[in-house]
Amino acid sequence: MKQLIFLLICLSCGTCSIYALKCRSQEGLSEAELKRTVRNCMHRQDEDEDRGRGGQGRQGNGYEYGYGMDHDQEEQDRNPGNRGGYGNRRQRGLRQSDGRNHTSNDGGQCVAQCFFEEMNMVDGNGMPDRRKVSYLLTKDLRDRELRNFFTDTVQQCFRYLESNGRGRHHKCSAARELVKCMSEYAKAQCEDWEEHGNMLFN
């Protein structure tokens, strides 16, 4: 009886390790290409922020951590007609709560959207497109289990966004929520996630 219990424990431990995916692969999109795209998007976001300040460049040390209102937010509240897509109080509140993890107000959201755009994963309105995201993430993967995981993750995350109405009208927040959702799935399923984390958007 003890041998049977030992055998069952060994088998269950063996099957647990089988289900932990190695999500980092030499197949698929190259890490260098992904990093280059994100860097370009971050650079573009910085330029857009500088233009929004009337060409004055960054004030102070260039880092805004979301502690209270900054100059840009005060300016947006005084000049509500000049929103540029980011001026309403609700969005500002989202940025402030999320701003502790980012060096710019809306940067993480719009960097994510820029990334999807640059990788041709958006629809005609600039919103992340389910089929394009799924195709681009899986087209070069030979490992069937990993390909299925990515496909399922994309499907589940788009369902989540649709069911909660998140980002339906704002492409930056939709992209950011999609990245967050896919990151959570990867964190839960990929054994090599802790080693590398989500280097692109966190």
Swiss-Prot record:
Tissue: Expressed in non-neuronal cells in hygrosensitive sensilla in the second chamber of the sacculus of the antenna third segment (at protein level).
GO CC terms in record: extracellular region
Pfam families hit by this protein: PBP_GOBP
Compositionally biased spans, kind Basic and acidic residues: 43-53
A Gene Ontology biological process term: response to low humidity
Null mutant phenotype: Viable with no morphological, mobility or chemosensory response defects. Results in defective hygrotaxis behavior which might be related to increased desiccation resistance and overall longer lifespan.
Predominant place of localization: secreted
GO molecular function, one term: odorant binding
Protein location: Secreted
InterPro entries listed in its UniProt record: Odorant-binding_protein, PBP/GOBP, PBP_GOBP_sf
Ranges of biased composition (kind: Gly residues): 54-65
Keyword Signal: yes
Keyword annotations: Behavior, Secreted, Signal, Sulfation
Signal peptide: 1-20
Region: Disordered, residue numbers: 43-105
Function: Odorant-binding protein required for hygrotaxis behavior in humidity-detecting sensilla.
Family: Belongs to the PBP/GOBP family.
Protein's name according to its UniProt entry: Odorant-binding protein 59a
Native organism taxonomy: Eukaryota, Metazoa, Ecdysozoa, Arthropoda, Hexapoda
